[in-house]
Amino acid sequence: MKSKKMLREILADGGAVVLPTETVYGLFAKALDESAVNHVYELKNRPRDKAMNLNVSSYEDILSYSKEQPDYLKKIYDAFLPGPLTIILKANDQVPKWINSGLATVGFRLPDHPVTRELIQAEGPLIGPSANKSGKASGRYFDQIRDQFDFQVTGYQDDDALLGVDSTILDLSGNKVKILRQGSITQEDILAKLPKISFEEV
């Protein structure tokens, strides 16, 4: 396990590090560094048409990389972020094609773990897909992750902080809200905070 200073140096040099979120471990790298992103795709054996999310540290960051945001976006942010929620918005021209595979949308994540948030604030935006080989279960245990990647990666260990449930993915890019992946935040949780939101059944 490396110190935060060393993890910052690895990220700054275009490397990838394993970091805890409130859900599962992620494999993080600098999002605006194409070679760093390519390195994560290769480590995970991830198909190139499978887009990455942007891990950011503020509401302003979300606005910086999206467009045509719904008027209730700030309410969702205030109610659930940072936390186990990924939101999908229309991407603006600041989002590199190597992040979202040239799609019209991009996902945003604000993990609720102090070390990871600090590193995102310092070196972000970062990509941070789950720390596992594609097709394998999401990474819950630091030592198992390092073993799975043949000890090619290092990071910050905090197994006890993880829920072990992936984040809910909420698509806000259309006229109605869609839950693309059910995680710990449910439709009922969202409606309790924002009762006027209209959901589309997937």
Where would I find each of the regions flagged by the language model?
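Active-site-adjacent structural elements in enzyme catalytic cores
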Residues: M1-V202
